[in-house]
UniProtKB/Swiss-Prot annotation:
Enzyme class: transferase
Domain of life: Bacteria
Organism: Rhodospirillum centenum (strain ATCC 51521 / SW)
Stated name of the protein: Phosphoglycerate kinase
Upper taxonomic lineage: Bacteria, Pseudomonadati, Pseudomonadota, Alphaproteobacteria, Rhodospirillales
Residues the entry annotates as binding substrate: D21, L22, N23, R36, H59, F60, G61, R62, R118, R151
């Protein structure tokens, strides 16, 4: 879809409202992971550099529709200043007199952060009056929070209809990367989908089999597909009540010309813990008292051969219990293969989802993928083929 970017805006002397995602982890009053701030910084610095008054809006945590110190964005100010290399003023509210006064007090080229949008119950209800009050604070609206774009809230959707609107640099990068990966991909496309349950990724799987040429399944959800094929799964995590849905996905894949790749071998252990004694055997040889905690080397080799023919890879979810060693080796190995092919310019690789980012960072390859999305829910809904309200509202 067509959308405006910062290139289409004239911002000098204007007040620009930027919806960012500053919902970052805080421990002992300090931001423990600044990734989202670092990714938002280029948009804020560009606007400030062009002489705009930059006004940042964001949610933080899950307050109950009223102010509370634990969920105040004030604690994010030092980390945001460090990410920007600029001082950041703070307003005690995101609408009303305190917000107006804080914006009036800054000069063009300066930045002010407004208090948590979710301190107003109307934010999550997409209350038109709250959106109107926010819009009254500025001249232009820029959405740079793809990670919140799946929510139709006052600061992500409502406000975009009330002001000239554009995508920030992070939103632009996300939309362009995702467009290349699924909307207009170079084929063949391989999707790697892992994680514990198919029940949480049913819509995603049903959509993906119609869009991709190969679907690699890993993690606990692969066991559900193996079970649906009548193969033994021991005491592995498997949603046996989802066998019919798994068969329906396989039938839809066959009708769509999508090849499903399931584990051929695995690391079988009797208990779920780091360093648990295990053996690597073909999936058919799992014992009744064993669980498959990772894919084995034969599976990695098989996926690697298939990867040689791919031009685009979309990754969501680990291949095994990556959080406990040595059951991260399957995820690490496949991720390493994708990273190497990306580095050689042979594939475009896009990954996203919370566990996925953590797994790729643990494997040391996150920086070697073409694009790693910081969006969790929004990335998943996009993979499900759903329209994202925050993106749709930017439509040019």
């Amino acid at each position: 879809m067509a959308f405006k970017t910062l290139d289409d805006l004239s911002v000098a002397g204007k007040t620009v409202l930027v919806r960012g995602d500053l919902n970052v982890p805080v421990q002992d009053g300090r931001v423990s992971d600044t990734t989202r701030l670092d990714r938002l910084a280029p948009t804020l610095k560009e606007l400030a550099g062009k002489g705009a008054k930059v006004v940042v809006l964001s949610h933080f945590g899950r307050p109950k529709g009223g102010p509370d110190a634990k969920n105040s964005l004030r604690q994010v100010v030092p980390a945001l200043e460090a990410a920007l290399g600029l001082p950041v003023a703070f307003a005690e509210d995101c609408v009303g007199e305190s917000a107006r006064a804080a914006i009036a007090a800054i000069e063009p080229g300066q930045v002010v952060l407004l208090e948590n949008t979710r301190f107003h119950a109307g934010e999550e209800k997409n209350d038109p009056e709250l959106a109107r009050q926010m819009a009254a604070l500025g001249d232009i609206y820029v959405n740079d929070a793809f990670s919140a774009a799946h929510r139709a809230h006052a600061s992500t959707e409502g406000i975009a209809h009330l002001l000239p609107s554009a995508a920030g640099r992070l939103m632009q990068a996300e939309l362009e990367a995702l467009g290349k990966a699924l909307a207009r991909p170079e084929r063949p496309v391989m999707a790697v989908v892992g994680g514990a349950k198919i029940s949480t990724k049913l819509d995603l799987l049903l959509n993906m089999v119609t869009k991709v040429d190969m679907l690699v399944l890993g993690g606990g959800m692969a066991n559900t597909f193996l079970f649906a094929q009548g193969r033994p799964v021991g005491k592995s995590l498997a949603e046996k009540d989802m066998a019919d849905q798994a068969r329906a996905i396989m039938e839809k894949a066959a009708a769509s010309g999508c090849e499903i790749l399931l584990p051929q071998d695995g690391a079988m252990a009797k208990e779920f813990k780091a360093g648990a004694p295990h053996r690597v055997v073909p999936v058919e040889q799992i014992a009744d008292d064993e669980m498959m905690l990772d894919v084995g080397p034969a599976t990695v080799e098989f996926v690697g051969l298939k990867l040689q023919g791919a031009k685009t890879v979309v990754w969501n979810g680990p291949m095994g219990a990556f959080e406990i060693r040595p059951f991260d080796s399957g995820t690490n190995a496949v991720a390493g293969l994708v990273a190497a092919l990306t580095g050689d310019g042979r594939v475009l690789s896009v990954a996203g989802g919370g566990d996925t980012v953590a797994a790729l960072e643990q494997a040391g390859v996150a920086g070697r993928f073409s694009y790693v999305s910081t969006a969790g829910g929004a990335f998943l809904e996009w993979l499900e083929g759903k329209e994202l309200p925050g993106v749709k509202a930017l439509g040019a």
